[in-house]
Amino acid sequence: MVKLKDGFTGERALVLPRMIVDKMEEDPLTSMLHITDIGYYPKAKYHFRERKEPINQFVFIYCIDGAGSYRIGDQEYNVSANQYFILPAGVPHSYASNPSTPWTIYWIHFKGTAAPFYAKDAGRPMDIKPERHSRIST
């Protein structure tokens, strides 16, 4: 099976330079919560990412269309449109787009002393209900 980390038509991604992240980690305000990477993958067919070696950031993934799945430890979850999940820092994990209905996702890597508070109880899929005048659109 084909497995792609990135390279999707229309994707957008920004990885902050290490020097910038280091400065944010030293600053009293931004050391509490800051992003390190941010992106958008539309119709990400064959998207797959596995991290056997844990990373020191939390990973927020918001699925706006399609479906996918993710694994934290031995627990596997399915995710569909208008759901998000947060992968914990320091824990091996994997995630993948559904090959028949590939997801469109926004994703953010974040860290900081307050990051665990924002990620609390978000290891399972959480629903988002966009409304007519919501800033979240699908």
Question: Which role fits each region the language model picked out?
Answer:
Residues M1-H34, R51, I128:
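A short, N-terminal "cap"/entry segment at the start of jelly-roll beta-barrel domains
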Residues V21, P116-K120, S137:
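Generic detector of well-ordered alpha-helical segments enriched in charged/polar residues
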Residues D121-T138:
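Aromatic/histidine-rich interaction motifs
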Residues T30-P125:
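N-terminal regulatory/effector-sensing and dimerization cores
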